[in-house]
Design a protein with these regions (language model features):
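Conserved catalytic cysteine-centered active-site region
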Residues: 29-31, 79-153, 157-164, 202-228, ...
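Extended C-terminal subregions enriched in glycine
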Residues: 274, 278, 282-305, 314-317, ...
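Short glycine/threonine-rich loop-to-helix capping motif typified by GTGT followed
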Residues: 83-92, 266-270, 302-326, 332, ...
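Condensing-enzyme catalytic core mediating Claisen C-C bond formation in acyl metabolism
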Residues: 18-52, 185, 216-279, 283, ...
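Active-site-proximal alpha-helical scaffold in enzymes
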Residues: 105-135, 162-196, 236-242, 350-373
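Beta-strand segments within the central parallel beta-sheet cores of soluble alpha/beta enzyme folds
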Residues: 70-79, 100-101, 129-134, 181-188, ...
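Conserved active-site "lid/cap" helical segment
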Residues: 18-108, 116, 172-180, 201-207, ...
Length: 408
């Protein structure tokens, strides 16, 4: 039976009100926190650096970008990539904090952290928050695999990340007529942007035919439908309006954030064609007081091409089932299409550090709002941007977070 887009479970109970009105101003993060510093590590391969060292280097880079020092930091945020968690990293980095958060939702952890940092700042728990990401999936041995309650029931069937995303793509094709050619356009757009990024892992512009002729990994996903695997990381500095305005950096203000988790909910039939973005998106838009029509640039999590397509639908940039038509013919290419996306090349071409691409999505959105993206991909008059990510496995249990920012 084909999936019914109208049957997607919507927000219920208390949270339904978030879709209908903005949050109370005294409970909202809107305008109460600014991104003062952003830094992406230039390396994509770091065999001679430790993970902790990479965390320290990105922290230094973000603080220097903001014009602050570690002595100014009183809040710290990290996820599962941080060796020893927040306690060890605060000690290693030489920080003195009065607030910390080690929420781990996989690839979207840093979008979640951004919202949590803004909430902490709005509540007066800290005034300068540092968020770091770093890891070495390319050159280091993989860490022990975390297991959920379903592990013993699924491991025997050799379910892998590629298999599961392949199932999502196949189901979307079955239900809505999406084609491999349409998915390929997402990679094509990313490659057009990556050619201008000197740090991108893959800089060559590709065609739809190139994508379709690349080896099949998990039907219908080809190798070029999959993200790169890179070492590296990134960091952000979030602060109060007063401190941000005292610094010599362009002002980027947070105006909305939402987060959600999707899972099988006690054995219910699982619909592979939508993500938790159907819930995180409306919350962020309601808090920001804007619509998809106001978004000039979008950073969209791109572990696979199908990830992008589904999230564009779920966030409301196009109707459910029409993502294939929306992304085709260069519609995501800056200067060509209606919605420029991932102008650094994204995870499909540039960087997917620690297999957690949410951090770089925020960083490129900040570049666009500051007017610091490469001139060939800079979006004219970019005043409102969206960053969105997922963490976990898109088709089954996963989290999503949506952040909306504006230039001041």
């Amino acid at each position: 039976m084909a999936s019914d887009p109208l049957a997607i479970p919507r927000l219920t109970g208390q949270t339904i009100r978030w879709e209908k009105r903005q949050r109370r101003s005294d409970l909202s993060i809107k305008g109460k926190a600014y991104i003062a510093g952003a830094y992406e590590h230039p390396t994509r391969k770091a065999p001679d650096k430790s993970i902790a060292q990479l965390h320290a280097e990105v922290a230094k880079g973000a603080l220097e970008d903001a014009g602050l020092t570690k002595a100014d930091v009183d809040g710290y945020f990290c996820a599962g990539d941080a060796p020893g968690g927040a306690m060890a990293m605060v000690d290693y980095l030489g920080l003195k904090v009065k607030h910390f958060d080690s929420t781990d939702t996989g690839g979207c952890s840093y979008l979640v952290h951004l919202g949590h940092a803004a909430e902490a700042i709005a509540a007066g728990k800290c005034s300068v928050a540092l968020i770091t990401l770093a890891g070495k999936p390319l050159t280091a041995a993989p860490p022990p695999r975390a297991t959920g309650a379903e592990h013993d029931f699924e491991v025997a069937y050799n379910a892998t990340t590629h298999n599961i995303y392949g199932m999502c793509a196949m189901r979307h094709m079955h239900d809505f007529g999406t084609t491999s050619e349409q998915l390929a356009w997402i990679k094509v757009a990313a490659s057009h942007h990556a050619q201008y990024n000197p740090h991108a892992m893959l800089k060559d512009v590709v065609t739809v035919e190139d994508v379709l002729n690349s080896p099949m990994i998990s039907d219908p996903l080809h190798r070029m439908d999959c993200c790169v695997v890179t070492d590296g990381g990134g960091a952000l500095v979030v602060t109060t309006p007063e401190i941000a305005k005292s610094l010599k950096r362009p002002l980027v203000r947070l105006i909305g954030q939402g987060e959600a988790i999707k899972g099988p909910r006690g054995g219910e039939a699982l619909d592979l064609t939508y993500s938790a973005g159907v819930w995180s998106g409306p919350v962020a838009f309601a808090e920001a007081g804007v619509t998809v029509k106001d978004i000039k640039y979008a950073s969209i999590y791109d572990s696979f091409t199908i990830t992008v397509l589904m999230q564009l639908e779920d966030l409301g940039f196009c109707k459910k089932g029409e993502g294939g038509k929306f992304v085709a013919d260069g519609n995501l290419i800056s200067g060509v299409g209606k919605l420029p996306f991932n102008t650094d090349g994204g995870g499909l071409c540039s960087n997917h550090p620690v297999n957690r691409g949410g951090m770089t999505k925020i960083i490129e959105a900040v570049r666009q709002l500051r007017g610091e993206a490469h001139p060939k991909v800079q979006v004219p008059n970019c005043d409102i941007a969206l960053a969105h990510g997922t963490g976990g496995l898109l088709g089954v249990r996963h989290a999503a977070s949506t952040v909306i920012m504006e230039r001041v």
